[in-house]
């Protein structure tokens, strides 16, 4: 009986220690979510301007076919690049599993008619893809928690260069969009070739003429890097905030589960104590009766 009581007390202490950790992780994630959302909001106006400029350039400047819209594929087997943004760590509910499930589903559809190469951002996603034998770009190794405009620029330069040289004919990005702190959605977006309807352009005919120096095509070849950089940066930020929000929810649920477990253990401990007291009282009564 005494051994069982000691075991329950030890179990309560253990669960309490775990609860402290999950509570701390919840608070850290909550703090980071707010900070990163503020950071994302502060950079959004710049990339919105880039998007507006791209729209004006397409509508009023680009009047001839261009590889960024027409595509670089001519013949043979098509080559497709998938940028996959996952987390760097676990303990975030189904966040990583949802991203990878959607990734493999998309891969299975695309791989029927094309060679698919993965460009993973995030340790969990990269390890998963390498472990299961998928074709992964070797020199493409970025962590989600290192999200910055600098990294987004490096990634956009690599991706656009591979598109121009024909190493990939299409590029998709898979990331997690934050709907709310308790809801995140895996999103797939086609990066290249560009789709004019993405800019709200149904008909690119326009009577207005804008002069671009040195010429519209040269300007587009420069601005495309800023445009792709903006999408990648936004996707990385959205994904990282989603990971933290998922971790917040997971750690909050874990803390609540720990509270429930502690209450059950305390109830069990009290019952054991009551049983000990009842037994001792019974022994005293039996002893007193024997003396009479």
UniProtKB/Swiss-Prot annotation:
Any Pfam family: ATP-synt
Superkingdom field: Bacteria
GO cellular component terms listed in the entry, alphabetical order: plasma membrane; proton-transporting ATP synthase complex
GO MF term list: ATP binding; proton-transporting ATP synthase activity, rotational mechanism
Membrane topology field: Peripheral membrane protein
InterPro entries recorded: ATP_synth_F1_ATPase_gsu, ATP_synth_F1_gsu, ATP_synth_F1_gsu_CS
SUPFAM superfamilies in the cross-refs: ATP synthase (F1-ATPase), gamma subunit (SSF52943)
One GO BP: proton motive force-driven plasma membrane ATP synthesis
Record has Hydrolase as a keyword: no
Compartments reported by the entry: Cell membrane
Keywords per UniProt: ATP synthesis, Cell membrane, CF(1), Hydrogen ion transport, Ion transport, Membrane, Transport
Record's function text: Produces ATP from ADP in the presence of a proton gradient across the membrane. The gamma chain is believed to be important in regulating ATPase activity and the flow of protons through the CF(0) complex.
Stated family: Belongs to the ATPase gamma chain family.
PANTHER family: ATP SYNTHASE GAMMA CHAIN, ATP SYNTHASE SUBUNIT GAMMA, MITOCHONDRIAL
Assembly: F-type ATPases have 2 components, CF(1) - the catalytic core - and CF(0) - the membrane proton channel. CF(1) has five subunits: alpha(3), beta(3), gamma(1), delta(1), epsilon(1). CF(0) has three main subunits: a, b and c.
Protein name: ATP synthase gamma chain
Gene: atpG
């Amino acid at each position: 009986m005494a051994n069982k009581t000691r075991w329950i007390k030890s179990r309560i202490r253990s669960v309490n220690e775990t609860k402290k950790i999950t509570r701390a992780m919840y608070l850290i994630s909550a703090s980071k979510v707010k900070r990163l959302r503020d950071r994302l909001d502060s950079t959004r106006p710049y990339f919105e301007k880039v998007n507006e400029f791209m729209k004006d350039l397409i509508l009023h400047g680009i009047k001839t076919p261009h590889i960024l819209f027409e595509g670089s594929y001519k013949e043979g087997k098509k080559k497709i690049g998938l940028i996959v943004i996952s987390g760097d760590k676990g303990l975030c509910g189904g966040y990583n599993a949802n991203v990878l499930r959607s990734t493999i589903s998309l891969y299975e559809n695309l791989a029927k008619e094309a060679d698919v190469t993965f460009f993973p951002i995030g340790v969990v996603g990269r390890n998963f893809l390498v472990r299961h034998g998928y074709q992964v770009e070797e020199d493409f190794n970025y962590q989600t928690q290192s999200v910055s405009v600098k990294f987004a620029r490096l990634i956009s330069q690599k991706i656009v260069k591979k598109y121009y040289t024909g190493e990939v004919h299409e590029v998709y990005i898979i990331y997690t969009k934050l709907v709310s702190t308790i809801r995140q959605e895996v999103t797939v977006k086609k990066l290249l070739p560009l789709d004019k309807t993405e800019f709200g352009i149904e008909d690119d005919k326009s009577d207005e003429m804008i002069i671009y120096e040195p010429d519209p095509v040269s300007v587009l070849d420069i601005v495309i890097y800023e445009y792709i950089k903006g999408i990648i940066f936004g996707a990385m930020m959205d994904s990282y905030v989603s990971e933290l929000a998922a971790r917040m929810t997971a750690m909050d649920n874990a803390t609540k589960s720990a509270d429930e477990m502690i209450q059950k253990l305390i109830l069990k401990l009290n019952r054991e104590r009551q049983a000990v007291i009842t037994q001792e009282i019974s022994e005293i009564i039996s002893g007193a009766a024997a003396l009479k």
